[in-house]
Amino acid sequence: YIGNPNLNNESSLEANAFVAFKNERISAKLSSNYFHISDYIVGKVIGGLVPMTIGGKGVKQYGSLDYATIFNADLNTQVQLFSFLKWNSQFTYARGKDYRKENLPFMSPLSYRSALQFYKNKLSAEFSVFGNSRYRDFAAVYGETETTDYTIFNVNAGYQFSFNGMKVLTKIGVENIFDRIYTTYADWNKIPRPGRNFYLNLNLNF
């Protein structure tokens, strides 16, 4: 990226709306917002220049658009299945357009995250899944390309115990259980995210 100190500051108009529901076991909230941004700053591809970074596909310079519009929406839910078992989910979506109705870069496709959380005395465990749909509304004008969909599974378990007056929390887990090769819409040059990995955490509270 090449900077540009002569750009005007962005200014925006924003509208928000949400609806929510909650009882003893279930809570849900659907929210959305809309932005109309004047002098929107974005990186524009410059032709004829060779990138210095190995693997780079072009050089961009920051410039401003007359205006851009961005719409975001998200749904959050929580269900208390049992006293020891909770289910959380989140769905998010974003869409952006410039003043020429071209797609804006770095707008998240439909993404989701869901987790089952178990708590019983000093034992805890979680099974989670997250992912993105295919990135079809990419901003080709601004140098973006399509990104495939993916779904990633994780699991962990923890236990808390006392030792010589200290509280010790241990947690062991596996991320990306099925060793899926994936990249997100925001990753530079489509460099893959980490594959299957194992971790062990040990927290000591004196």
Labelled PLM ranges:
Residues 21-22, 118:
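Generic beta-strand structural signal
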Residues 13, 73, 77-93, 103-206:
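Conserved C-terminal beta-signal and adjacent last beta-strands/turns
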Residues 2-8, 14, 23, 27-86:
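Outer membrane beta-barrel strand-and-loop segments of large Gram-negative receptors
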Residues 18:
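Small/polar-residue-rich segments within soluble enzyme cores
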Residues 1-4, 13, 54-62, 96-99, ...:
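Extracytoplasmic loops and strand-loop junctions of Gram-negative outer membrane beta-barrel proteins
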